[in-house]
Regions:
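Catalytic cores of the polymerase beta-like nucleotidyltransferase superfamily
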Residues: 1-159
Length: 159
């Protein structure tokens, strides 16, 4: 599964975009736990991804996901949840941001995430990228929010 995910990244990178596996899959990989939940973060927009993966089925209605910069792509029978690098603003329903702004910076995108251990990335060569020290927290068995804990949990109640 990891090999197909890295292949998926290479396709996006081949079109001149950055792309990384992020979150639970990378965390579980480091812990040597098998995972089937593959999240990708990229500076490619949903429309640019649709242009890249013209022969790939998008299981969700793109219009529903465009406002959050997320698409689901099935590639080689594996579901990839792909999200454009972004900043989020004001959560009004305790689940979804009222607006987002695409950014071209991985670190800015990672800083909007929930926990440091879920902000660890893997590049197309399998290298671990840990800009927010999530590996240290993982080693020390610490779950630490990236932002103010109260704000993080009230913004998104599913955290």
């Amino acid at each position: 599964m990891k090999e197909i995910a890295l292949e998926f990244l290479k396709i996006i990178n081949g079109f001149g975009y950055e792309a990384y596996i992020v979150g639970g899959f990378v965390r579980d990989y480091i812990m040597k736990i098998q995972s089937h939940d593959i999240d990708i973060t990229t500076n490619a927009t949903p429309q640019e991804l649709k242009n890249i993966f013209t022969n790939v089925k998008f299981p969700k209605n793109m219009n529903d996901q465009d406002c959050y910069g997320s698409v689901s792509i099935i590639y080689k029978n594996i579901l990839f949840e792909v999200t454009t690098f972004r900043e989020e603003y004001a959560y009004l329903d305790n689940r979804h941001p009222s607006s987002i702004h695409y950014v071209d910076d991985l670190e800015t995108d990672l800083k909007r995430r929930d926990f440091t251990i879920n902000a660890i990335c893997m590049d197309q060569n399998g290298n671990i990228i840990d800009l927010l020290n999530g590996k240290t927290d993982l080693t020390n068995k610490v779950i630490k929010t990236i932002n103010n804990p109260y704000k993080s949990f009230t913004d998104d109640a599913l955290r």
